[in-house]
Every structure is written in structure tokens, then in C-alpha cells.
């Protein structure tokens, strides 16, 4: 929560008089795809039951009607339960984990057609795609065999590549709402505790699952942003 407040303070105090900016909040759910739990890319019913919402703050710098720089901090809360898996083998194994990822993201957002916040003579709805680079801090997990639970043994500092699709619309002269779905390919195979020896050599802990594939985490949610800055004179990049 402190990170979100700090980010909102920085981006709202950095206003210049040349471009149009957006700053706001993010709320949704984060699904995990790896070696523990369900392999479904979306599982909204589970998040409603487990109350594992993800939240964060986002800032966009609209550099032209077709693209923007975007920066975000999101606290992803995810989990996996083998008994919810479609795999009989996983159901019999019975592992479970919970993990929390603090994600710092920088990227580019491309609009499918021109997005002009200052033109309200026509409906302002546009689909978009975004990618970039994420850095995250998560728990480095390992198995606690008697309890069949994967628990924290260290910190996991790593990167991920996001691919995000969304649609956004201006609901007033100052507010924009967006729905987006984004998959993150992580540069680690241990968000679920299946490969604890990835960065730590522990003789008594054995890795399991597919060691040739890294983990994914998938976020789906809504953003609400407030726009500020005068009507822009767009640059050439």
C-alpha cells in the first residue's frame, strides 16, 4: 500500500504543460499456470472464493494518438491447489501454495486506432495491446512434505515479459476506464515451489514438475485513470 501511495504522489507531482497524462488504480485477479494447481489460464470463480484480489497503480504518458508509455506497480496475489487441477496425478499429489508478487512494470501501449482524449464528438473506445518489461519480487518457495504445503524459504527477484490486450473508453472529460487481460512469462520456474534449487542448493529438497518450462502468471482486471495536462502537441516518437 505504501508503494501505491508513493507512486501516485510522484506521478501526480510530475505534471508538465506539454502532454496528456493518465494516473489511476488497477483492480483484478491473478491466475497462475505452472507445476502446481489448475492449468487453466483464467479461473475467476476460485478468486471469488479465496478473496485473492490483486491491486495497484498505473501511469500513462500519451505520446501520440496511437501510442503511450505506461508504468505500473501491481501487488499480485496468486495461489495453486492441486486438488483443483484437471490432472489426476496432481490431485493425488496434493500440493498447494500461496504467493505474493510485487511487480514493477514499464512498457509501450499501442492503440488499434487513434485515441484522442480531447475529441468528444465521437465515441472514445479503442482496443489496445501492450508489452514491455516487468521486474518482480516474490517468495522463493520450497516443499514442506509433511503438510503438503509449499512454503517460503527465500526471496525471488526476477523478470517477466508481459503481453496485454485491452479495451478502454473515456467515460467523461477526465476519467478513462479500461478492461485488460495480460499474460506474463516469468524468467523463473519457482513461483510455485516446484524448483527450489533454481537459485539455492538444498540437498534435502527435490524439484518436481516440468523443469524445461518456466511459470506464467495472468492478470485480468479493470483500470480507472484520471487525465491531466493541457491539450497536447504530440511529438514525433
For every predicted segment, state its role.
Residues 61, 65-144, 228:
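Gram-negative (and chloroplast) outer-membrane scaffold detector with strong preference
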Residues 25-29, 57-61, 106-110, 131-135, ...:
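Residues on the lipid-exposed face of transmembrane beta-strands in outer-membrane beta-barrel proteins
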Residues 17-60, 140, 219-231, 237:
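Short glycine/proline- and aromatic-enriched beta-strand/turn motifs that initiate or cap beta-hairpins
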Residues 40-47, 90-97, 147-153, 207-210:
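Extracellular loop and loop/strand-boundary signature of outer-membrane beta-barrel proteins
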Residues 35-41, 81-88, 120-122, 140-148, ...:
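Outer-membrane beta-barrel translocator domains and adjoining extracellular loop/strand segments
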Residues 171-237:
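Predominantly the C-terminal beta-signal and adjacent terminal strand-loop region
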Residues 19-23, 65-69, 100-102, 123-127, ...:
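Outer-envelope beta-barrel architecture signal
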Residues 19, 49-53, 100-104, 125, ...:
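Residues that define the transmembrane beta-barrel architecture of outer-membrane proteins
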Amino acid at each position: 500500500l505504501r508503494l501505491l501511495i508513493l507512486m501516485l504522489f510522484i506521478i501526480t507531482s510530475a505534471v508538465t504543460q506539454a502532454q496528456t497524462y493518465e494516473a489511476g488504480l488497477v483492480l483484478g485477479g491473478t491466475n497462475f499456470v505452472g507445476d502446481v494447481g489448475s492449468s487453466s489460464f483464467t479461473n475467476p470463480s476460485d478468486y471469488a472464493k479465496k478473496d485473492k484480489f490483486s491491486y495497484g497503480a498505473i501511469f500513462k504518458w500519451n505520446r501520440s494518438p496511437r501510442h503511450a508509455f505506461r508504468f505500473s506497480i501491481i501487488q499480485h496475489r496468486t495461489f495453486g491447489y492441486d486438488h483443483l487441477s484437471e490432472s489426476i496425478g496432481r490431485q493425488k499429489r496434493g500440493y498447494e501454495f500461496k504467493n505474493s508478487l510485487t511487480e514493477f512494470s514499464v512498457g509501450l501501449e499501442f492503440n488499434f486506432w487513434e485515441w484522442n482524449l480531447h475529441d468528444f464528438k465521437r465515441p472514445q473506445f479503442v482496443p489496445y495491446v501492450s508489452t514491455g518489461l516487468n521486474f518482480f519480487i516474490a517468495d522463493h518457495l520450497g516443499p514442506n512434505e509433511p503438510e503438503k504445503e509449499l512454503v517460503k524459504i527465500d526471496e525471488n527477484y526476477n523478470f517477466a515479459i508481459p503481453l496485454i490486450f485491452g479495451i478502454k473508453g473515456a467515460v467523461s472529460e477526465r476519467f478513462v476506464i479500461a478492461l485488460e487481460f495480460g499474460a506474463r512469462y516469468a524468467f523463473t520456474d519457482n513461483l510455485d515451489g516446484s524448483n527450489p534449487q533454481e537459485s539455492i542448493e538444498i540437498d534435502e529438497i527435490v524439484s518436481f514438475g516440468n523443469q524445461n518450462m518456466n511459470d506464467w502468471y495472468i492478470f485480468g482486471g479493470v483500470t480507472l485513470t484520471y487525465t491531466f495536462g493541457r491539450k497536447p502537441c504530440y511529438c514525433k516518437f
